[in-house]
């Protein structure tokens, strides 16, 4: 059976791919030209509408403060949602039925509710039950909604990552004397996070974008809300949307690039483990393990394990 998803394209497939690429490029160019013409017909390309973005006032008064609030809300939400999601993800696999039940109920409940509804409910709760100032209340409500929703989603991501690992990882950890908690924190969870890092990063990107919901509904002065204030002062609605959209794209691209770099670094560190242990260290794999576990097999390995340099016959 072939180990690749697709066979190498032949001459006809290559010609077809080239033709489709050319057609797609032409259609994309026509779409961009149509958008450009429509904007020009509506006078949205006039320099007077774009000129404010070349001045420091538009950035220091509107965009940069809004970007700062966006990053602050997203960073706080990430710092709380990541460990909280890991805790609930692990709790859903507990040996105790009541722990699994409580964790599963919490995760499914908050995952089913729209994040905007959670923000609105949190805002009303802070208005009626706390003394938080009106200036800080939108930030608290946005962070609360983002944490409750995204922690439940991250819990499922972590649980799926742990369940995707081979059972041999757990058995090997038990064989060397690790308890279940140590196995989870030292063996399974680090590997699960590495394996599910793309999904985790995608959820972090969602957190950054969902901060805009607080600006629309709660008056939170994040980037999109600051854009509306800028557009009201300079009467450049479409240009301001385009500039803010580019800022979001750059922000999420940087986050994704950092995650890709981190994933490669983690994988390289795993590959270099043997070099750190030393040249004389024998790397043991399941195929090279002699003896049996718990039956008093030959050799001096722990709990009846025998480690040999050669595979068993």
How does the language model describe each region?
Residues 1-313:
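Transmembrane alpha-helices and adjacent helix-loop boundaries
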């Amino acid at each position: 059976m072939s180990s690749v998803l697709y066979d190498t394209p032949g001459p006809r497939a290559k010609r077809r791919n080239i033709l489709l690429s050319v057609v797609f490029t032409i259609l994309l160019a026509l779409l961009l030209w149509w958008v450009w013409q429509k904007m020009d017909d509506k006078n949205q390309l006039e320099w007077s509408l774009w000129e404010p973005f070349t001045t420091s006032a538009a950035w220091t008064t509107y965009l940069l403060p809004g970007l700062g609030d966006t990053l602050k809300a997203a960073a706080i939400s990430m710092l709380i949602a990541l460990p909280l999601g890991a805790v609930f993800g692990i709790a859903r696999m507990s040996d105790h039925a009541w722990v699994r039940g409580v964790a599963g109920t919490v995760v499914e409940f908050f995952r089913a509710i729209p994040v905007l509804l959670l923000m609105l409910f949190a805002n009303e709760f802070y208005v009626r039950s706390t003394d938080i100032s009106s200036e800080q209340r939108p930030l608290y409500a946005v962070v609360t909604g983002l944490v409750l929703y995204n922690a439940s989603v991250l819990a499922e991501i972590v649980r799926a990552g742990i369940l995707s690992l081979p059972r041999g990882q757990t058995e090997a950890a038990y064989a060397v004397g690790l308890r279940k908690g140590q196995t989870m924190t030292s063996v399974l969870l680090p590997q699960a996070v590495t394996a599910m890092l793309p999904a985790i990063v995608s959820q972090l990107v969602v957190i950054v974008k969902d901060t805009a919901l607080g600006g629309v509904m709660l008056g939170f002065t994040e980037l999109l809300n600051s854009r509306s204030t800028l557009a009201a002062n300079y009467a450049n609605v479409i240009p301001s949307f385009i500039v803010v959209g580019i800022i979001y794209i750059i922000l999420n691209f940087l986050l994704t690039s950092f995650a890709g770099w981190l994933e490669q670094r983690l994988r390289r560190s795993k590959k270099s483990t043997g070099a750190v242990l030393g040249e004389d260290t024998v790397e043991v794999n399941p195929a090279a393990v002699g003896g049996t576990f718990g039956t008093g097999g030959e050799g001096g390995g722990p709990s009846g394990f025998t480690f040999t340099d050669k595979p068993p016959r």
